[in-house]
Design a protein with these regions (language model features):
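C-terminal catalytic subdomain
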Residues: 101-173
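Accessory alpha-helical/coil subdomains and C-terminal extensions
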Residues: 1-134
Length: 173
């Protein structure tokens, strides 16, 4: 999944940077409480100062005003700003950013369904900074894409499946 995120972020960055008009592209990546997958987006950088310029993880509090200031400051050196955010970014009070604009439902386990922080930030950037903004939600593809599957991943998946079937046949739960 990390390889997929890094590669996809790189491709989105290349697309975002073909225009000379100021723009912000916000990429929303899985990660309710752990930001390792979003952190993998840093691997998309080819040099210091390359996009994604800003990466936000759920392990730290997210401040909307500080975010806007950093995006605005990034335009001093870059015409196009790519931002990667974990779906679970939250403010200092623990409120998920995706809840700012909508009532998040709950899944079958009672967890809040997190989606939409990218869209919220896209609208915020557009209205407050007056620049072109768009958001991309990697969503299901980052979890199920086999395009970047490594041989080791495949072997471990087969072994885990075999172990699970054997445990079930032995009556283990």
């Amino acid at each position: 999944a990390a390889r997929y995120v890094a590669s996809t972020v790189r491709e989105i960055t290349l697309d975002a940077c073909v225009y000379e008009k100021k723009s912000v592209t916000i990429i929303e990546i899985m990660g309710r409480h752990a930001g390792w997958l979003t952190g993998a987006a840093a691997l998309a950088r080819k040099y210091v100062g390359d996009n994604p310029l800003l990466i936000y993880l759920p392990e730290t509090d997210f401040d909307v005003e500080e975010f806007l200031q950093k995006v605005h400051a990034a335009f001093e050196k870059n015409c196009n700003v790519v931002v990667c955010v974990s779906e679970g970014i939250h403010d200092k009070d623990g409120t998920f950013i995706c809840e700012y604009d909508s009532a998040a439902g709950t899944d079958a386990f009672g967890h809040k369904m997190l989606a939409g922080c990218g869209k919220y930030l896209e609208n915020l950037v557009r209205s407050r900074l007056g620049v072109k903004a768009r958001s991309v939600e990697l969503n299901v593809s980052q979890r199920c894409s086999a395009a970047m599957l490594a041989g080791t991943d495949q072997q471990e998946g087969i072994l885990a499946g075999e172990f699970g079937v054997q445990a079930a046949l032995n009556g283990e739960t």
